[in-house]
């Protein structure tokens, strides 16, 4: 018998709690998070596989793998998110890595992974911190071309993870953290300032003053987007709805048919984070599944097309 599996697609934003939004929208967001939290805790996963991105806090251009499994991981605590060690399951992580290698995925493995809000915020929303069920963290590069995984590869990875889980008698929750449409001011190697290019290439721990400055710049960018600044790429609720529609009906082929460049053009440079959802959902059977939670709002102050999507399957 194959153990039950569940999927949670969850956007994240470091600006939650930093940039104010309308009280009614705050209540809506908190109510939606409470609903998904209630569903996940009632479902009671025995293992969590979390696919998330990084924002130049743990992975840098000096060595940027498309995907990396962590046997141990520490959250750096950026933007006020929880800091400290994740409750990783190294045996499950290594077994998954071996399975992926056997299925021709040349997967990277980190024995000491650093992660940021791209991982920690999702765990905090559901479990109130980093004290979670046993966890396998999988980093996905979503910012540094040309190594951003393509849609077909994301689907294939998720399907391979699903085959691994077929032989694992544990109720497993797969979380995709990221997206949806958004383009925050994340620097690239095309930046004209060599100091900026160096900062996203070479691993180092920023000072608190540098972190504070980065936070203020991001808060200002959120306010600018909310004010309609033409220099900021707008969110794309229509694109976000199509993405969520495809995953809700269990149709990954509708997403792998998309043009890679169109993701950036239509939804923003950082919308590639949405591929974490595709990886996670592809580990579950195709086709419609019970989906007790779906919620979405475009929230410019957070620079986020913010979505929540929870689906589950029963044992077969």
List the predicted regions and their residue ranges:
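Flexible, D/E/H-enriched segments
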Residues: 1-45, 61-156, 167, 187-316
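Beta-strand elements within well-structured catalytic alpha/beta cores of enzymes
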Residues: 46-52, 138, 170-180
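Conserved catalytic-core segments centered on acid/base and nucleophilic motifs
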Residues: 164-165, 174
């Amino acid at each position: 018998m194959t153990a039950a599996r569940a999927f949670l697609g969850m956007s994240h934003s470091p600006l939650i709690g930093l940039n104010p939004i309308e009280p009614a929208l705050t209540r809506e967001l908190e109510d939606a998070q409470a609903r998904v939290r209630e569903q996940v805790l009632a479902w009671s996963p025995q293992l969590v596989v979390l696919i998330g991105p990084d924002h130049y806090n743990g992975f840098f251009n000096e060595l940027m793998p498309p995907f990396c499994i962590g046997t141990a991981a520490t959250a750096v605590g950026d933007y006020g998110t929880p800091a400290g060690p994740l409750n990783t399951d190294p045996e499950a992580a290594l077994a998954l890595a071996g399975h992926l290698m056997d299925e021709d995925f040349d997967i990277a493995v980190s024995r000491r992974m650093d992660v940021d809000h791209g991982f920690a915020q999702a765990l905090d929303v559901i479990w109130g911190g980093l004290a979670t069920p046993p966890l396998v963290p999988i980093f996905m590069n979503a910012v540094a071309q040309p190594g951003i995984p393509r849609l077909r590869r994301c689907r294939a990875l998720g399907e391979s993870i699903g085959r691994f889980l077929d032989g694992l008698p544990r109720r497993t929750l797969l979380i995709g953290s990221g997206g949806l449409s958004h383009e925050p001011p994340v620097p690239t190697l095309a930046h004209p300032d060599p100091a900026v290019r160096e900062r996203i290439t070479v691993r180092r721990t920023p000072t608190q003053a540098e972190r504070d400055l980065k936070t203020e710049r991001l808060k200002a960018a959120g306010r600018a987007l909310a004010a309609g600044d033409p220099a900021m790429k707008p969110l794309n609720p229509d694109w976000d709805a199509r993405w969520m529609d495809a995953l809700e009906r269990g149709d990954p082929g509708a997403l792998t048919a998309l043009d890679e460049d169109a993701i950036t053009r239509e939804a923003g440079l950082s919308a590639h984070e949405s591929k974490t959802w595709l990886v996670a959902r592809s580990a579950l059977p195709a086709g419609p599944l019970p989906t007790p939670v779906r919620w979405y709002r475009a929230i410019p102050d957070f620079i986020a097309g913010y979505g929540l999507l929870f689906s589950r399957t029963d044992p077969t």
